[in-house]
């Protein structure tokens, strides 16, 4: 069985806020095209206490399509959780593609590792258990022009997205893409105030309001904010 549309967290997280439309998209377009190992990983993750952090299947297909259109080979992922977006990326990259994946919690990554191994893409992944900022700063010190990344995906601690951006805009090549997940935050970013959120959710909401304004004014990137999942902002590096 696929994800239950009755699962509050799944509907609440999706920007559509429509159970019927979400069900239609998932069952008509997403689940039929979902890789067997992604399906298995999704079903295991849905039982996890933090299942709301799972990247939705329709968003996964979107990421896969973008990676293939870009012909991406070198990518970086900040925030891995159980690895649904990571496995999506690994499947989309060519056989010699490489992913640098950074997360503070390796135990979550190990939930998804058997599915990554069964998919035959473990060799593409370099997992680093660490806070992301020190790793990114070290990369900046050692990076050569030919080592720049084609693509980055960020789905980690929300209050640090702007700090990640300052590093990634130097680590991703000109013409490459930096994607930020959850930037519409349940749709709550549209309002100056949004009563009822838990304190940590409110911190994230305010962080995203600031980030969205910041990215819109950043001349180093052109952006598109996509209403899929909980909102994905694509920033293409210009210089």
Curated annotation (Swiss-Prot):
Q: Which reaction does it catalyse?
A: norbelladine + S-adenosyl-L-methionine = 4'-O-methylnorbelladine + S-adenosyl-L-homocysteine + H(+)
Write one Gene Ontology MF term. S-adenosylmethionine-dependent methyltransferase activity
* Cited Gene3D superfamilies: Vaccinia Virus protein VP39
The cofactors it requires, by name, are: Mg(2+)
Pathway(s) of this molecule = Alkaloid biosynthesis
Q: Which PROSITE patterns match?
A: SAM_OMT_I
* Source organism, top-level taxon: Eukaryota
Task: Name the enzyme group at the top EC level.
Answer: transferase
Q: What are the binding positions for a divalent metal cation in this chain?
A: 155, 181-182
| Protein EC | 2.1.1.336
| SUPFAM superfamilies, sorted | S-adenosyl-L-methionine-dependent methyltransferases
Q: Which residues bind S-adenosyl-L-methionine?
A: 55, 77, 79-80, 85, 103, 132, 157
What GO terms describe the biological role, i.e. biological process, of this protein?
Answer: alkaloid metabolic process; methylation
Instruction: Give the record's keywords alphabetically.
Output: Alkaloid metabolism, Metal-binding, Methyltransferase, S-adenosyl-L-methionine, Transferase
Name the family the entry cites: Belongs to the class I-like SAM-binding methyltransferase superfamily. Cation-dependent O-methyltransferase family.
The role this protein plays is: 4'-O-methyltransferase converting norbelladine to 4'-O-methylnorbelladine. 4'-O-methylnorbelladine is a precursor to all Amaryllidaceae alkaloids such as galanthamine, lycorine and haemanthamine, and including haemanthamine- and crinamine-type alkaloids, promising anticancer agents.
The identity of this protein, by name, is: Norbelladine 4'-O-methyltransferase 3
Q: Which organism is the protein's source? A: Narcissus aff. pseudonarcissus MK-2014
**Per UniProt, what is the name of the gene that codes for the protein in this document?**
N4OMT3
